[in-house]
Structures are given as structure tokens and as C-alpha cells.
């Protein structure tokens, strides 16, 4: 079962609405859903909520360390409360998924995501769960940093918010350790992928 839910992002009003903060948006939504308000806890370098569900303690964590050193916050809380890596779920922005889609994944590469990279290093393993929230790709690698640190269009923001709401429906399964069920709930609730525009033949 998942005992620690983490949302990645950067602290500060200037980053609040940027694509890189999609993980923050999700953990805020989960906090509201569980009625577990996040409060600052300097021991864990972030905002923390603790709640009890079905007799079991569940933690929510929003690192305030800046994205590139998120692992410091995650590892501090996980180690103190003896939460194993495979009991951790990290919600983060994902370039390789279009806005409006979300994927659940266990383990694997950080794929260049600096927040995940630091969590890998601090936990000493990549064996934790990720909730990959699609924010789309600018199409050019050189534009990636600028892309994630900008606000999405209104259309994309709405699509991201909708997928965040859908992913919340899998939380009971995640808490119960029913990971196959959670995966199915998340992956089968996706909207259809937009079709590319049809090519029209030039008239004679």
C-alpha cells in the first residue's frame, strides 16, 4: 500500500501556476479530498499532512526545497517513519505525456527529471511509484526548461486539472495496495488521444 504521497514542484508564487508544479497541484487536490490540511514542518523540509485511513497512517508531503533537491525532503520523512520506497508515490509533471493524460508507473529511469533524479539519489533506489501527469513537450529539447517553467494555456490547464481529478479516484486502491486496480482505474479513464489533422489534397 502507499503510505507516503509526494507532490513535486517549486515553492513561491512565481512558480505556482507553471507546468513544473503539476505535482503540487495534485497533492493539493489530494489534501482537499482527504480533508488533511498541509502544514509547514521544517524537520521534513516541506508541508506535511498526516491522516488515518482504515486504521492506517498516511502521509502527504509537498517538498519546499526546490525541485532539484526534492529527495532531501522525501528521504527525511520516509526514513524517520520507516516507509519503504515501494510505499512511496511521487506525483510529477511529465513531458512525454500530453496534457489531459496521466500514467502510473513503478521504478525505472528518472528520464532527466531533476526532482526524480534527486529522489533516486537520496533513497538509493528507483523502486518507488510515480504518478506521471502529462504537461506535453515543446517539441524542441532546447526549449524544455523554458516550457516547464511557464504557465500552460488555459485549455491545457483545464485538461491537466481534469486528469488530476480522475487520478484521485484511484486513491482508495492505492491505499489498499491494489496497484493493478489503481493502474487500470487511472489508465482506462483517459480521454481519447487527439487525432492529427487530416491532410487535404490540393485541388487541381
Swiss-Prot record:
GO terms for cellular component: cytoplasm. The active site is at 20 (proton acceptor). GO terms for biological process: protein quality control for misfolded or incompletely synthesized proteins; rescue of stalled ribosome. TRNA binds at residues 15, 66, 68, 114. The record marks 93 as: Stabilizes the basic form of H active site to accept a proton. The keyword tRNA-binding applies. Its EC number is 3.1.1.29. It catalyses: an N-acyl-L-alpha-aminoacyl-tRNA + H2O = an N-acyl-L-amino acid + a tRNA + H(+). Residues 185-204 are annotated as: Disordered. It is an enzyme of class 3 (hydrolase). It is found in: Cytoplasm. PANTHER family: PEPTIDYL-TRNA HYDROLASE (PTHR17224:SF1). Hydrolyzes ribosome-free peptidyl-tRNAs (with 1 or more amino acids incorporated), which drop off the ribosome during protein synthesis, or as a result of ribosome stalling. Catalyzes the release of premature peptidyl moieties from peptidyl-tRNA molecules trapped in stalled 50S ribosomal subunits, and thus maintains levels of free tRNAs and 50S ribosomes. This is Peptidyl-tRNA hydrolase.
Amino acid at each position: 500500500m502507499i503510505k507516503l504521497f509526494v507532490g513535486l514542484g517549486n515553492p513561491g508564487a512565481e512558480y505556482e501556476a507553471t507546468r513544473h508544479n503539476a505535482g503540487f497541484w495534485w497533492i493539493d487536490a489530494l489534501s482537499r479530498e482527504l480533508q488533511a490540511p498541509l502544514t509547514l514542518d521544517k524537520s521534513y523540509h516541506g508541508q506535511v499532512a498526516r491522516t488515518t485511513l482504515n486504521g492506517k497512517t498516511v502521509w502527504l508531503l509537498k517538498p519546499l526545497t526546490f525541485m532539484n533537491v526534492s529527495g532531501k525532503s522525501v528521504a527525511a520523512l520516509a526514513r524517520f517513519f520507516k516507509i519503504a520506497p515501494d510505499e512511496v508515490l511521487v506525483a510529477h509533471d511529465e513531458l512525454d505525456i500530453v496534457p489531459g493524460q496521466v500514467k502510473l508507473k513503478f521504478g525505472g529511469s528518472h528520464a532527466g527529471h531533476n526532482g526524480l533524479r534527486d529522489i533516486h539519489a537520496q533513497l538509493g533506489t528507483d523502486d518507488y511509484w510515480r504518478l506521471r501527469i502529462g504537461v506535453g513537450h515543446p517539441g524542441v529539447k532546447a526549449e524544455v526548461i523554458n516550457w516547464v517553467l511557464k504557465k500552460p494555456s488555459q485549455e491545457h490547464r483545464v485538461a491537466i486539472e481534469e486528469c488530476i481529478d480522475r487520478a484521485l479516484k484511484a486513491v482508495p486502491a492505492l491505499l489498499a495496495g491494489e496497484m493493478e486496480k489503481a493502474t487500470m482505474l487511472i489508465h482506462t479513464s483517459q480521454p481519447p488521444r487527439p487525432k492529427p489533422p487530416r491532410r487535404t489534397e490540393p485541388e487541381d
